[in-house]
């Protein structure tokens, strides 16, 4: 794989003198990480999105790629039965999620004048069913309950009866994540001894008081250090941020309470694509692979529909795409991290992943928007 004249290229020589080239357009928002790149360097390109989250924008960070290519390592870090130890060593191999947790609460503690409230929910999409990894049974044990996707009155896609917990620190957030990971479906394959068989979606919901007057505006500008604010403005790999307009404020309620803004951060560790001839799966694992393949195909189909500006995007072809409808449809700033293998054996999956990245990068859905808190847009929900 080479980076030449602003283009990412991968060539396959079928026979001498022939070849297939897959290239990304010259794009300053595209970043390529080599094998020696640190987890801290990768997080450096994610960090500006936390500025957007604190400003009230929805954000989604998604790892995509074949099984065994490093998605879970990128999002979570090296596999361990123990949770991460905070505060983090900048040179540690912990991934994006624990780094997001620590940085988010560091930024919140710098200015608490906007009364921030943080809630966390964790689900997995397994065999095209959604399971709540924070739901508890009658004896308060976390059990992973099956849930359904619903659409709220304001049009937002949500999970009915989804358990969420308020958190006040990065350690508490990661404690919940670690507990949810213990329930995540896994199955060994010839490619990966600890292969995840589900899509993991961690949603961090941040509710803050809106900057509605000059005093609040000053507080908002003080939320981040100058260099962090400038980095947020110049953040890379922001498909939805181009041409973003200043979002409208959420009206206060009749009781005179302060205006509020609710923003969601979705951290997605997708299940990996795989070839049955390479992974060697049979039985239940084969069914899992088929469901994973269908959901990833549905994801590519939605991006294709958005890219071609079709009148209808098939979000409901998969629960994964239905659940991610808000961020895929242009309501969020979306960052996709493609994880690929350098092995010639996995060339077909590598080319497929790069093709997905090209499609995702070309989708333009207009400006991201702030969303009001659910308490101000509460309405009857209907199952889809």
UniProtKB/Swiss-Prot annotation:
Belongs to the TRAFAC class myosin-kinesin ATPase superfamily. Kinesin family. GO terms for biological process: establishment of spindle orientation; microtubule-based movement; mitotic sister chromatid segregation; negative regulation of autophagy; negative regulation of mitotic centrosome separation; nucleus localization; organelle organization; protein homotetramerization. Transmembrane segments: none annotated. One of its GO terms (molecular function) is minus-end-directed microtubule motor activity. The gene is KIF25. The lineage of its organism: Eukaryota, Metazoa, Chordata, Craniata, Vertebrata. Residues 7-363 form the Kinesin motor domain. This is Kinesin-like protein KIF25. Minus-end microtubule-dependent motor protein. Acts as a negative regulator of centrosome separation required to prevent premature centrosome separation during interphase. Required to maintain a centered nucleus to ensure that the spindle is stably oriented at the onset of mitosis. May also act as a negative regulator of amino acid starvation-induced autophagy. The keyword Nucleotide-binding applies.
């Amino acid at each position: 794989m080479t980076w030449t004249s602003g283009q990412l290229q991968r060539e396959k020589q079928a026979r001498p003198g022939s070849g297939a080239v897959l290239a990304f357009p010259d794009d300053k928002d595209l970043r390529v990480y080599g094998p020696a790149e640190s987890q801290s360097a990768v997080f450096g390109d994610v960090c500006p999105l936390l500025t957007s989250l604190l400003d009230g924008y929805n954000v989604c960070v998604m790892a995509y790629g074949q099984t065994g290519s490093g998605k879970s390592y990128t999002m979570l870090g090296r596999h361990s039965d123990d949770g991460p130890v905070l505060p983090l060593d900048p040179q540690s191999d912990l991934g994006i999620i624990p780094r997001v947790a620590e940085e988010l609460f560091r930024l919140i503690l710098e200015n608490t004048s906007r009364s921030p409230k943080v809630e966390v929910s964790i689900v997995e999409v397994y065999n095209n069913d959604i399971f709540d990894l924070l739901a508890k049974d009658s004896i308060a044990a976390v059990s992973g309950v099956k849930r359904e996707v619903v659409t709220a009155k304001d049009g937002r896609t949500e999970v009915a009866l989804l358990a969420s917990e308020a958190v006040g620190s990065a350690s508490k957030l990661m404690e919940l994540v670690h507990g949810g990971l213990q329930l995540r479906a896994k199955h060994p394959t010839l490619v990966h001894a600890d292969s995840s068989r589900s899509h993991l979606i961690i949603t961090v919901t941040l509710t803050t008081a809106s900057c509605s007057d000059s005093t609040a505006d000053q507080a908002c500008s003080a939320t981040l250090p100058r260099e962090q604010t400038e980095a947020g403005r110049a953040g890379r790999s922001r498909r939805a941020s181009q041409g973003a307009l200043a979002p409208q404020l959420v009206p206060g309620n009749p009781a005179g309470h302060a205006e509020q803004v609710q923003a969601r951060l979705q951290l997605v560790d997708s299940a990996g694509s795989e070839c049955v001839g390479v992974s060697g799966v049979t039985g239940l694992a084969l069914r899992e692979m088929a469901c994973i393949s269908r959901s990833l195909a549905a994801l590519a189909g939605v991006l294709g529909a958005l890219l071609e500006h079709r009148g209808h995007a098939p979000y409901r072809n998969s629960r994964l795409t239905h659940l991610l409808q808000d961020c895929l449809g242009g309501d969020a700033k979306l960052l996709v991290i493609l994880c690929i293998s350098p092995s010639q054996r996995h060339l077909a999956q590598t080319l497929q992943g790069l093709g997905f990245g090209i499609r995702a990068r070309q989708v333009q859905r207009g400006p991201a928007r702030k969303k009001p808190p659910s308490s101000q847009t509460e309405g009857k929900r209907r199952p889809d």
